[in-house]
């Protein structure tokens, strides 16, 4: 038989599910009666789940788990003690009873706050350091207007008398006139080569 094995499995599953023939299990009831249900809940063969997923009906209350490891309300404490006088006595000494008092330190919040504070201080210190370095670097560079007045050879001494600057060099001469250019002899004043060699014979 050729084909996909998944189609064969799907066919077998559908034929099994759609089977309407009477079976022996149809005579059994789904729900248990009160005696059987109580014996199931109180049997020692069943493994307790230790109050996982809020199964408080199956496991007894625990004061340390419900009120000391986490905050509990008056009703939760009453469920544990099952007596109003014992509950009131406990509630007066409970630190989260709503009447104030000093509670325990939340370590996670303290760690997050301290880490954030230290990080903020480090970032502020780095920002101040970079700003001071930028100002120091900017203070060492002269302004463009002052750059022409300060000679690189003169020492910068604000306390002493200013040293005189050397006189500026004379301006370069301008272009010569036409007559001056003709009268001047230069390298390129030679006559042009003769054109006899370039003529074609007729």
UniProtKB/Swiss-Prot annotation:
Outcome (variant: residue 174 to A): No effect on interaction with YAP1
Cytoplasmic topological intervals: 131-202
InterPro entries referenced in this protein's UniProt entry, alphabetically: Coagulation_fac-like_Gla_dom, GLA-like_dom_SF, GLA_domain, Peptidase_S1_coag_factors
A GO cellular component annotation in the UniProt record: extracellular space
Modified residues (4-carboxyglutamate): 70
Gene3D superfamilies referenced in this protein's UniProt entry, alphabetically: Coagulation Factor IX
Pfam families: Gla
Transmembrane feature ranges: 110-130
Main location: membrane
Disulphide bridges, residue numbers: 67-72
Short motif PPXY motif, span: 192-195
Post-translational modification as stated in the protein's UniProt record: Gamma-carboxyglutamate residues are formed by vitamin K dependent carboxylation. These residues are essential for the binding of calcium.
SUPFAM superfamilies: GLA-domain (SSF57630)
Membrane topology: Single-pass type I membrane protein
Tissues with expression: Widely expressed with highest levels in kidney. Also highly expressed in the thyroid.
Domain named Gla: residues: 50-96
Key words, A-Z: Cell membrane, Disulfide bond, Gamma-carboxyglutamic acid, Membrane, Signal, Transmembrane, Transmembrane helix
GO molecular function, one term: calcium ion binding
Record bears the keyword Kinase: no
Keyword set includes Metal-binding: no
Propeptide stretch(es), residue numbers: 24-49
Region (Disordered): 143-202
Localisation per UniProt entry: Cell membrane
Effect of residue 173 to A: No effect on interaction with YAP1
Complexes and interactors: Interacts with NEDD4. Interacts (via cytoplasmic domain) with transcriptional coactivator YAP1.
Entry protein name: Transmembrane gamma-carboxyglutamic acid protein 2
Species for this entry: Homo sapiens (Human)
